[in-house]
């Protein structure tokens, strides 16, 4: 409702208490203006929204800075211009609305930041600057003492956490959970499991599940491939063709048809759009031709054909709504009773899948080239193999770094978290201040000084005392 400035969200289930017939709406708000008006208890956002701080006085509503409430428009920010009443609008179905005074409320007391390892480099530098404004707005005074908000940050791949927390949040003390511990073979994030000595081909599902719960079955297995004298494209063609054709051959065998699902969809991981673009052409031509060669070489009963619908990519070139559909379809399993499968054959992607792709059925991935950061390699390969192992890393023999990782393959993969690089964040460096300091000052002026909150409040800059400016700086 454009005039009413709200969006009603109902459940499609007629028996739900939030269905359309009950008149109740799901208390979830998706539009920025509605979030400002409703001031919900929990706010989920991305860090790029920090850029709105100096541009709108309504952002202050997220920190409890309200002094009026309109029955139609919701909370009104301190210093925001707003009419005292609204006349009824019969055409829009809106009743007369009054604006009444209200008290400000407490700002957020708990901030949860996920994927801390991604806040690094230029993003982390700008983020650290804006974080000073967010923390200042979340502080409350009690008995002459300033109480700051509590932060909970999570990540699975981090090094020098104390230094990064100091640069981002200005905190010298922090508690890390879980602690490092006393046994290097079990660090909570990764556990060293000895390979089983018995043959598990004929093991029952109950036995395998029991081994998983007891921590006796490896979840993820890595295989390194480095073909000297061959190009990476040639290696990739042969690897993809043998994996795809072998998956179909095994799926046609009655004794394995119930276990082939994790390996029927191949995830291809690439370090750049350029490398991925070359793989798209290979899938359309060379890999399809090579599959025919593999089929004839091993006398397979049936050839694996890669349809257009069975090949997808997850990159920045694809619209966001298409990516959501691809991720949803990735959960479709192999069905032994269907001749035409609904699951994907191949999905190729860049580091977009390193965060947020959680599909338990996936068990097979090919990583072309060692990523620049080891944390990216760990995050990307953890998207698959959560229940069933299988990751192939194709190294480029003509790149010294790839060759070094291949030669130290076992040592590296047995202690990957040891090789995670430290993050770099410098929010208070000279060049960083040049970029962001003016925005921070404007944000604090608009959010803390009532006469400067409105867009026209800049003309009141002479009314600011020297003490106020010193406090802000």
Feature roles, as predicted:
Residues 343, 379, 383-418:
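Conserved segment of the helicase C-terminal RecA-like domain
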Residues 41-50, 338-354:
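Conserved two-lobed SF2 helicase motor
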Residues 1-31, 64-102:
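Cys/His-rich short segments
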Residues 40, 48, 62-84, 102-140:
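SF2 helicase catalytic motif II
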Residues 353-369, 391-394:
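A short beta-strand element within the Helicase C-terminal
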Residues 318-349:
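Conserved helicase ATPase core of P-loop NTP-dependent helicases/translocases
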Residues 115-125, 134-164, 179-180:
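Conserved helicase ATPase motor motifs in RecA-like P-loop NTPase domains
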Residues 149, 159-167, 172-286:
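Conserved interdomain linker/interface between the two RecA-like ATPase lobes of SF2 helicase motors
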């Amino acid at each position: 409702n454009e005039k009413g400035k709200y969006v009603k969200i109902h459940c499609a289930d007629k028996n739900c208490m939030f269905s359309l017939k009950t008149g109740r709406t799901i208390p979830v708000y998706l539009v920025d203006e509605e979030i400002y008006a409703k001031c919900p208890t929990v706010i989920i956002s991305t860090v790029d929204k920090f850029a709105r701080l100096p541009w709108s006085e309504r952002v202050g509503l997220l920190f409890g800075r309200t002094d009026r409430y309109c029955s139609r428009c919701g909370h009104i920010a301190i210093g925001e211009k707003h009419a005292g009443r609204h006349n009824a609008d019969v055409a829009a179905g809106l009743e007369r609305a009054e604006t009444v005074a209200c008290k400000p409320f407490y700002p957020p007391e708990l901030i949860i930041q996920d994927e801390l390892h991604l806040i690094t480099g230029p993003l982390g530098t700008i983020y650290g600057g804006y974080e000073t404004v967010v923390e200042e707005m979340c502080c409350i005074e009690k008995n002459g003492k300033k109480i700051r908000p509590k932060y909970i940050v999570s990540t699975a791949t981090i090094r020098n956490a104390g230094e990064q927390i100091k640069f981002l949040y200005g905190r010298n003390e922090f508690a890390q959970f879980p602690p490092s511990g006393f046994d290097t073979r079990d660090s909570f994030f990764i556990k060293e499991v000895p390979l089983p000595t018995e043959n598990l081909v004929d093991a029952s599902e109950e036995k395998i599940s029991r081994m998983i719960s007891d921590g006796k079955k490896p979840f993820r297995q890595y295989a390194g491939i480095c073909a000297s004298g061959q190009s990476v494209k040639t290696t990739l063609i042969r690897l993809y063709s043998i994996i795809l054709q072998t998956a179909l051959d095994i799926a046609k065998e009655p004794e394995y048809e119930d276990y082939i699902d994790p390996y029927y969809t191949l995830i291809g991981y690439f370090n750049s759009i350029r490398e991925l673009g070359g793989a798209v052409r290979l899938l359309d031509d060379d890999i399809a031709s090579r599959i025919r060669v593999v089929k004839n070489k091993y006398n397979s009963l049936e050839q694996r054909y890669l349809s257009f619908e069975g090949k997808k990519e997850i990159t920045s070139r694809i619209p966001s709504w298409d990516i959501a559909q691809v991720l949803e379809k990735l959960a479709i399993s192999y069905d032994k009773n269907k001749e035409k499968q609904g699951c994907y054959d191949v999905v190729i992607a860049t580091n977009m899948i390193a965060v947020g792709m959680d599909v338990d059925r996936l068990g097979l991935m090919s990583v072309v080239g060692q990523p620049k950061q080891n944390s990216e390699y760990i995050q990307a390969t953890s998207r698959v193999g959560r229940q069933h192992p299988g990751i192939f890393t194709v190294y480029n023999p003509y790149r010294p770094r790839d060759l070094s990782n291949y030669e130290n393959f076992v040592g590296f993969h047995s202690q990957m978290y040891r090789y995670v690089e430290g993050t770099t964040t410098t929010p208070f460096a000279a060049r960083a201040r040049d970029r962001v300091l003016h925005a921070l000052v404007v944000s604090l002026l608009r959010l803390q000084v009532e006469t400067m909150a409105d867009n026209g409040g800049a003309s009141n800059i002479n009314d600011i005392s020297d003490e106020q400016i010193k406090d802000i700086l």
